[in-house]
Amino acid sequence: MELQVGIADYKLGSSPVKIVTYGLGSCVGVSFYEPRLKLGALLHIMLPDSTQFSGKLKPEKFADTGIPLVVRELEKQGARKSSLEVKMVGGAQMFSGPGAQTVMNIGERNIEMCRKVIARMGLKLVAEDVGGNKGRTMILDTATGNVTVKIIGNIVKVI
């Protein structure tokens, strides 16, 4: 069975489910895996920081609110935060041209904020495939904790 995660969303699943998110450009996918329970989650983050916005926000959209939300949901299912294996994929520079690096560096900002939140929460970032300028698909196998990354141009790697 396969669960699909949309932009600014997350899904939880347990073995033998595969959780997939498509279209990771400047967005970052963060997977969480609890090996003892064979329980996992995949979060598709769109923006780094919710504090720049007002009103009712979807916490899954942002690194600073989405990562803590998913960890809480996993803990409700019996996961131990200290056992979670975290992997991160995406954060590409999808825009080019004059000023693109300084103005539109959403991918790099997403990567930086994810790393900060993961470290602040005391989580273990065990692997990542980030940056560059190509879109990615991310698939978490809840039977093993392996993450398959498909990069545009027929490149496939397992992290």
From Swiss-Prot:
Identification of the protein by name: Probable chemoreceptor glutamine deamidase CheD
GO BP annotation list: chemotaxis
Sequence similarity: Belongs to the CheD family.
Listed EC numbers: 3.5.1.44
Top-level taxonomic group: Bacteria
Organism of provenance: Carboxydothermus hydrogenoformans (strain ATCC BAA-161 / DSM 6008 / Z-2901)
Catalytic activity, reaction form: L-glutaminyl-[protein] + H2O = L-glutamyl-[protein] + NH4(+)
GO molecular function, one term: protein-glutamine glutaminase activity
Chain's role: Probably deamidates glutamine residues to glutamate on methyl-accepting chemotaxis receptors (MCPs), playing an important role in chemotaxis.
First-tier enzyme category under EC: hydrolase
Gene: cheD
